Amino acid sequence: MKRIILVIWLLLPAVAIAYHLGPGQKQMTMDQANRLLREAEELAALDSWSQVALRYEEALQLLPKEEVLIRQQLRLELAKAQMLSSQLPVAHRALGDLVDELKEEGVGSQTLLQEARSAHANSQYYMTWLMRLEGQPEE
């Protein structure tokens, strides 16, 4: 009995290292992304939208491709932050791409699609005003 306990005790570090180097890496990147999202929320409360957009971009790079719905929600929030940080043309293109992607899938969240359409419509409105302020003729 003592040998079995000793063998288990000696194998425990090997199991821990195997977990850390395997599935633990994914958990660590998810934790890092979560930390960035919390920072973005804190910065949003301070109206520091350019920093919020940077945190969202970093978190988006860390998220795995399999997390489609979370990535789409994050892309929407990134575009909203870009709109508020004077990056309107970039946000408008990103929202257009997101709306097209959500319509093609058809399986995704309808509320997310409605939110993306609403944000895209707002960006279109402000893009129109921006073009008028720059002196471009009406189409």
Show which residues each predicted segment covers:
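Short coil/linker segments at helix-helix boundaries
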Residues: 69, 88-105, 124-139
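Flexible helix-coil transition and linker loops at the boundaries of alpha-helical arrays
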Residues: 22-26, 61-69, 101-113
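Short, charged, amphipathic alpha-helical segments
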Residues: 73-75, 114-115, 138-139
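Short, charge-rich amphipathic alpha-helical segments embedded
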Residues: 54-83, 108
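"A position-specific structural signal for the A-helix of alpha-solenoid helical repeats
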Residues: 31, 38, 70, 77, ...
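Residues that mark the junctions of alpha-helical repeat units in TPR/alpha-solenoid scaffolds
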Residues: 25, 32, 51, 71, ...
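N-terminal leader/linker segments that initiate helical-solenoid repeat arrays
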Residues: 2-55
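Helix-turn-helix repeat elements of alpha-solenoid scaffolds
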Residues: 13-15, 44-58, 84-101, 139
